[in-house]
Amino acid sequence: MTDNARQIVLEHATEGAKLRERYFQQNADRVVELALQMALTLARGRKIMFCGNGGSAADAQHLAAEFVNRFMMERPPLPALALTTDSSILTAIGNDYGFEQVFQKQVQALGQPGDMLVGISTSGNSPNVVLALKAAREKGVTTVGMTGRGGGEMAALCDYLLDVSDRRTPLVQEIHITVGHLLCQLTDHFLFENVLALQPYLEGKAPE
């Protein structure tokens, strides 16, 4: 039994490492592109919102905390919030309108043109995240998806999509939080270490 348990550990680590290496070989440029857009969003005085369910809700809260507090360097707090944390709002909307609208209504209330919404879903099909992305598009909020399994319904709603094309939920989640950490680090890099990279875009050039 001990040998079997050890094998489970090693197989998970091996498969996770293979998927991680393949993912970042294919998507490194997309991660950098999104981090640049996050930095521009914040440099323009806008905010980043996050939403998801279950483990993805935990990721949403984790990443919002990294922006508001700090990541790896000392720097000013950055405006970010998770739409998963207020039990009164979540239960009021869920009770009166249904769980599908718990993020949508918050985006309608809080989202402003130029803000960003990051929806996290390992399936890409979470109804409440899908509706939140639709609401964001209606309000001129930049839409981002962190998904698995090809992106699902979210793919068509996202200005930026980081999809882990795999059906193993734990491995998808592990890459999501790694991507999130890289986005935090790179956003800090653009805002506080390489601000010259932002200047052309702040002066009117559209990101490529």
UniProtKB/Swiss-Prot annotation:
GO terms for cellular component: cytoplasm. It is an enzyme of class 5 (isomerase). GO terms for molecular function: carbohydrate derivative binding; D-sedoheptulose 7-phosphate isomerase activity; zinc ion binding. It comes from the Bacteria. Keywords: Carbohydrate metabolism, Cytoplasm, Isomerase, Metal-binding, Zinc. This is Phosphoheptose isomerase. Homotetramer. Binds 1 zinc ion per subunit. SUPFAM superfamilies: SIS domain (SSF53697). InterPro entries: GmhA/DiaA, Phosphoheptose_Isoase, SIS_dom, SIS_dom_sf, SIS_GmhA/DiaA_subfam. Belongs to the SIS family. GmhA subfamily. Substrate binds at N53, G54, G55, E66, N95, D96, S121, T122, S123, S126, Q173.
